[in-house]
Design a protein with these regions (language model features):
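N-terminal glycine-/charge-rich "phosphate-binding" loop or analogous flexible N-terminal tail
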Residues: 1-49
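Phosphate/diphosphate ligand-binding glycine-rich loop within oxidoreductases
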Residues: 48-97
Length: 97
């Protein structure tokens, strides 16, 4: 299983890199915090896990992300950025961190 931190600013990227350990799933860090929702399919490139700091993930865009199964949202107000129930209906599970 592999993931992508889709919208990391430099500070979050450095922190995330420091937390990675041997045996963790492969996670690529996209160091562009200014992505648009339409860029998700290209940035994820088939990854099963999207780690999201602040970029909206509309359900219609999520459906275009081949292989996406899990969204890890860094915050407590995921509903402001995505619809967890709609995503679950498509087989994509939202997790809060």
């Amino acid at each position: 299983m592999r993931g992508v931190f889709v919208d990391a600013n430099e500070s979050l990227a450095v922190i995330f890199e420091g937390l990675q350990k041997d045996g963790d799933p492969e996670v690529r860090i996209n160091r562009n915090p200014d992505i648009t929702p339409e860029q998700y399919p290209e940035i994820l490139d088939g990854a099963e896990i999207a780690i999201v700091d602040h970029t909206a993930l509309p359900t219609d865009i999520a459906k275009k992300c081949a292989g996406l199964k899990h969204v890890v949202f860094l915050g407590t107000r995921a509903r402001s950025y995505m619809n967890p129930e709609e995503l679950a209906e498509t087989g994509i599970h939202v997790h809060l961190l």
